[in-house]
C-alpha cells in the first residue's frame, strides 16, 4: 500500500487503541442492574461503539416499553462512567493495545492525518489519549458521542470524519 494515497486514518478507541471493553462491560452490567434494566456483559459487546444515550434508550424500551427520560439518561450514564473509571483505576489504568503506539508513530511519519472516531463520550478516556499513547491526537480530529446525532453502527461518525479530513 502506498501511504501517500492515504490522507487520513480513522481509529476507534475501545478495543483498537485501548483494551477498555472489559471495564465497560462490567460497568454497564452493574449500573443497568442497579436500575433494574436487564443488560449483560455480552450486550455491552454487541453495543460497542454506540453512544451511551442510545444504549440506555434501547435498554429502557426493552425492559419498560418506553423511552428513557433525559434525567434517566444523564443519571445512568454518569453512574456508568464513574463505575468505569473506578474499575480502570483499580486495575492500574486503561491498557493500551499491544503495538498500537508503533502503528501511530508510523502513520504520523507518513504525514497522514490521524483521527479518533469513537462512540465514547467519556472525557476521561478522551483526555487520556495523548498521555497513554504517543502525542499524535488533536482535539479537532476527534469524532465522539458529542459530535453526532447517530452513533455507530450508523455511518454518521465515519462520514463526519471523512468530510472533515478533506
PLM features: residue spans?
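N-terminal helical cap/lid subdomain that shapes the substrate entry/recognition surface
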Residues: 3-13, 17-98, 105-110, 123
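Substrate-recognition "cap/lid" segment bordering the active-site pocket of phosphatases
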Residues: 93, 120-166
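Well-ordered alpha-helical segments embedded in enzymatic catalytic cores
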Residues: 99-103, 157-160
